[in-house]
Amino acid sequence: MDKVCAVFGGSRGIGRAVAQLMAQKGYRLAIVSRNLEVAKVTAGELGGNHLAFRCDVAKEQDVQSTFQEMEKHLGPVNFLVNAAGINRDSLLVRTKTEDMISQLHTNLLGSMLTCKAAMKTMIQQGGSIVNVGSIIGLKGNVGQSAYSATKGGLVGFSRSLAKEVARKKIRVNVVAPGFIRTDMTRHLKEEHFKKNIPLGRFGETLEVAHAVVFLLESPYITGHVLIVDGGLQLTV
């Protein structure tokens, strides 16, 4: 199988787990991260002909150059996963403007830029995109107003794009995780939060990755938001 999957934010967390599953299925991976050395380690661990690329998704020129390099060395991108994201928890009245902007640029603008760049080849051949959102973007949370805005915006963007490009055989979906064991949740006390999760625990990155891969490969699903949260949305 020579289809190419680009995973932005693929060097760690959910993105890394997605890359592992897609590699096992025989796809060629482009592991994209702001830290090239970490991306190279991840690509090397996958084995085979997988490559690492450096990109700051908030910078349009970076994104465009990265897609050019991926196409040059791997071929046209068939699957795109946007898993790069940051969070700066704070009550709105205490949130620095620069923290709002950085979250908007990485979590929302970054995915918009990568999707736009992917369209250049996907319009000709079709493709599948999964943007990693968050249950916070659907339900909101105290101290995460800016983060919630970026992830909620990602849902609106993804659904609109799905309508725009469906006739070109391009599918766009969102996976919205709840509390998942990643670097972003490392500081949280699981014992405190899991009592509100019907399944009684935080999720694993691989569990979210299975949902991402399902949407990537499902030929008749587009514009969908798949919640992977252990039932958390039932209680909030």
From Swiss-Prot:
Keywords, sorted A to Z: Acetylation, Fatty acid biosynthesis, Fatty acid metabolism, Lipid biosynthesis, Lipid metabolism, Mitochondrion, NAD, NADP, Oxidoreductase
Reaction(s) this enzyme catalyzes, per UniProt: a (3R)-hydroxyacyl-[ACP] + NADP(+) = a 3-oxoacyl-[ACP] + NADPH + H(+); a quinone + NADPH + H(+) = a quinol + NADP(+)
InterPro entries named among the record's database cross-references: NAD(P)-bd_dom_sf, Sc_DH/Rdtase_CS, SDR_fam
Pfam families recorded: adh_short_C2
Binding site for substrate: S134
Residues carrying N6-acetyllysine: K40, K96, K194
Positions of modified residues (N-acetylmethionine): M1
GO terms of biological process kind: daunorubicin metabolic process; doxorubicin metabolic process; fatty acid biosynthetic process; protein heterotetramerization; protein homotetramerization
Family: Belongs to the short-chain dehydrogenases/reductases (SDR) family.
Full protein name: 3-oxoacyl-[acyl-carrier-protein] reductase
Name of the gene: Cbr4
